[in-house]
């Protein structure tokens, strides 16, 4: 899980999701997981 100021899609499988006020990226590739913080 990467924590970044700006989250971006890395590949076409990445989805940007807002959960409990935080922006997250979920993907089938585990290395692409990010959250904004």
UniProtKB/Swiss-Prot annotation:
Xref: Pfam families: Ribosomal_L36
Keywords, alphabetical: Ribonucleoprotein, Ribosomal protein
GO BP field: translation
Keyword Ribosomal protein: yes
GO cellular component entries: cytoplasm; ribonucleoprotein complex; ribosome
A single GO molecular function term of this UniProt record: structural constituent of ribosome
Family the entry assigns: Belongs to the bacterial ribosomal protein bL36 family.
HAMAP family per record: Ribosomal_bL36
The protein's name: Large ribosomal subunit protein bL36
The organism of origin for this protein: Halorhodospira halophila (strain DSM 244 / SL1) (Ectothiorhodospira halophila (strain DSM 244 / SL1))
Lineage, top ranks: Bacteria, Pseudomonadati, Pseudomonadota, Gammaproteobacteria, Chromatiales
Encoding gene (name): rpmJ
């Amino acid at each position: 899980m990467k924590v970044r100021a700006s989250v971006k899609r890395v590949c076409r499988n990445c989805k940007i999701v807002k959960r409990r006020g935080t922006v997250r990226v979920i993907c089938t590739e585990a290395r692409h997981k990010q959250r904004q913080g």
